[in-house]
Every structure is written in C-alpha cells, then in structure tokens.
Swiss-Prot record:
<feature type="binding site">
    <location>
        <position position="44"/>
    </location>
    <ligand>
        <name>NADP(+)</name>
    </ligand>
</feature>
<feature type="active site" description="Proton donor">
    <location>
        <position position="172"/>
    </location>
</feature>
<feature type="active site" description="Proton donor">
    <location>
        <position position="186"/>
    </location>
</feature>
<keyword id="KW-0521">NADP</keyword>
<feature type="binding site">
    <location>
        <position position="156"/>
    </location>
    <ligand>
        <name>NADP(+)</name>
    </ligand>
</feature>
<dbReference type="Pfam" id="PF00106">
    <property type="entry name" value="adh_short"/>
</dbReference>
<feature type="active site" description="Lowers pKa of active site Tyr">
    <location>
        <position position="190"/>
    </location>
</feature>
<dbReference type="InterPro" id="IPR002347">
    <property type="entry name" value="SDR_fam"/>
</dbReference>
<dbReference type="GO" id="GO:0016491">
    <property type="term" value="F:oxidoreductase activity"/>
</dbReference>
<comment type="function">
    <text>Short chain dehydrogenase/reductase; part of the ergochrome gene cluster responsible for the typical purple-black color of the ergot sclerotia. The ergochrome gene cluster produces several ergot pigments including the yellow ergochrome secalonic acid and its derivatives, as well as the red anthraquinones endocrocin and clavorubin. The pathway begins with the synthesis of atrochrysone thioester by the polyketide synthase (PKS) CPUR_05437. The atrochrysone carboxyl ACP thioesterase CPUR_05436 then breaks the thioester bond and releases the atrochrysone carboxylic acid from CPUR_05437.</text>
</comment>
<feature type="binding site">
    <location>
        <position position="186"/>
    </location>
    <ligand>
        <name>NADP(+)</name>
    </ligand>
</feature>
<comment type="pathway">
    <text>Secondary metabolite biosynthesis.</text>
</comment>
<protein>
    <recommendedName>
        <fullName>Short chain dehydrogenase/reductase CPUR_05418</fullName>
        <ecNumber>1.1.1.-</ecNumber>
    </recommendedName>
</protein>
<comment type="similarity">
    <text>Belongs to the short-chain dehydrogenases/reductases (SDR) family.</text>
</comment>
<keyword id="KW-0560">Oxidoreductase</keyword>
<feature type="binding site">
    <location>
        <position position="190"/>
    </location>
    <ligand>
        <name>NADP(+)</name>
    </ligand>
</feature>
<feature type="binding site">
    <location>
        <position position="221"/>
    </location>
    <ligand>
        <name>NADP(+)</name>
    </ligand>
</feature>
C-alpha cells in the first residue's frame, strides 16, 4: 500500500468559506453548542471506536438518556460501554452487534429503541491505496455497500419511523469533494452518500416534519484506517474532540440553516452562522454537485 509522506497541512490549504480553521475543539461547540440531551436517544453506527466513540462520549457528556452503539465487534463495544458508563453513569449504553449493511437488522434495532432523536452515521469502509485497476470487484462492492448503500438504507428506515423530529449526522470525508490519489472508489462512495443526504433533506422541506440532515468532514483524525495510509508524522492531525463537539452543535437548533448541506468540522461555527443569509438565497452553496 502506498503511503503519504508530505508534511504540508494539506487540508488547511483547501479553499473554505470561513477564515478560521479549527484543529481542536473550542468553547463555542464544547459548552455552548445549544444541544439539550435530556431524555434523548442517540444511535451511532461505528460508535465503538475512533470518531464514532468520540461522538458517543460527547453526547453522553451532554446528558442524553440513551446511546445505542451499532457495530460489528462485540469486544470493542464492551470496552466502549465500560469507558462511557464510567465517565457518564447517568447515560444508558445499549449495544447492537451488526453490520450496517444488514438493513433488516437495523430496522429491528429501530423498532426496539422505539424512538431515536439523533442518528449518527459513522461506520465506513476503506480500500487499499492502489489504482482502480488493482482493486477487486469484491473490494468495490464492499466499499459502496458500506459507505453508500447502507447510508441510504439506514436513513430511509430511520426517516420512516414514527415521530416528526429527527436529525441525521452523516460523517463523510473531504474526498467526497475532491480528487484524492488512489482513493477512487472510497471518494466516489462518499460523494454518492452526500448526494443522497442532500436529496433527502430537500424531500422533507415543507412537509411539516422536522427532519434535518447534515453531512460533514470530521477533520484529519488518526484512526487504525488512517494509520494504514499515512506515515508517522506525515499529517497534522486534528483532535478527535473536534468532530465530537461539532456533532453536538449540529444536533442543536442553531444549525438549522445548514440542513441538507456539506460542511467541515474544521470550519468555525460563528463564521458559518455569518453565512446564513447567503445559504438562504443560494440552495447550491455548500453542497456537492456541478460547479459552473
């Protein structure tokens, strides 16, 4: 597998709508996010490790009643449950061992929970960093099934459940918006999922339902998957609390103006709020699509 050895802060160099680029959490999203967790249930796919676990801890810290973690590894789930409950004993941690590609199992989880206020879609699959011709058909199918098809299916099933107040936080990737060498299928799968989330948000506008859908790049967070691609010291890593606390802000009421948009956790939220008028006037701003 080829590795990236550049020491340039590549992600910060990408054009963005805010002047300020955040690499760590800050008070505006850690304590003044506006999300009220009282009595709420949060379901997180891939929530037993990495970014998903950081997000789970953030919601527990915000006082939600229940956090349901859906992932494939029971051992990892049990470790995550112990960590969260030790720090936040008032939050109940529920574990569901399943693949996100199993739509029937996900439907039964939703039925068992009987009400989910926030769905965090964090599970993802990557492929070897090789040219497209060197990937197998099985590789391609697995990445699209996990990153695209399951995202659509889980969002479809969730929005069909009773209740009019639902929030979807889709953890995406910067490769959804740009070319990344030797990441062809991964990038395409992420872009497809963002497009689907944009359509979903539009479908619910004016229906009377409060269905909010946000896709976001979590930042450059070190995970086992990223460790297989980047050499030590090659990337200026962001703090995992950044996407975790950004998720709290997105789940709160102040982010309504970003419904259906694609953003980065690195973008300063006050500077995003300052763009509210432009977003109201330009339905294509901060979306994935054709640029003319």
């Amino acid at each position: 597998m080829a590795s990236i050895t550049t020491t340039t802060n590549f992600f910060e160099s990408i054009p963005r709508p805010t002047k300020t680029y955040r690499s760590a959490s800050y008070d505006r999203i850690s304590t003044r996010h506006g999300f009220n967790g009282t009595g709420k249930t949060v379901l997180i796919t891939g929530g037993s490790s990495g970014i998903g676990l950081s997000i789970a801890k953030a919601f527990a810290g915000a006082g939600v009643a229940r956090i349901a973690i859906l992932s494939r590894s029971r051992a990892t789930q049990l470790t995550a449950k112990a960590e969260i409950e030790a720090a936040y004993p008032s939050t109940s941690i529920l574990l569901f061992e399943a693949s996100v590609t199993d739509a029937d199992r996900f439907a039964s989880v939703l039925e068992e929970l009987a009400g989910v206020h926030v769905l965090v879609l964090c599970a993802a699959a990557v492929h070897a960093r090789v040219p497209l011709a060197e990937l197998s058909g099985k590789d391609v199918q697995h990445v699209f099934d996990t990153n695209s098809v399951s995202t659509v299916n889980l969002a479809r099933l969730y929005t069909a459940t009773p209740g009019k107040d639902k929030t979807i936080l889709h953890v995406s990737s910067a490769v959804a918006q740009m070319y990344a060498p030797l990441r062809s299928v991964y990038g395409a799968s992420k872009a497809a999922a963002v497009q689907a989330m944009q359509h979903l948000a539009r479908e619910h506008q004016g229906t009377g339902d409060r269905v909010r859908v946000f896709s976001f790049h979590p930042g450059a967070i070190t995970t086992p998957a990223s460790g297989a691609i980047y050499t030590p010291g090659a990337v200026q890593w962001d703090d995992a609390d950044l996407p975790a606390h950004f998720s709290l802000w997105l789940a709160g009421p102040e982010s309504d103006f970003l419904n259906g948009r694609y953003v980065w956790a690195n973008w300063d939220v006050d500077e995003l709020v300052a763009l509210k008028e432009r977003l109201a006037c330009d339905g294509r701003f901060l979306t994935i699509g054709l640029v003319l």
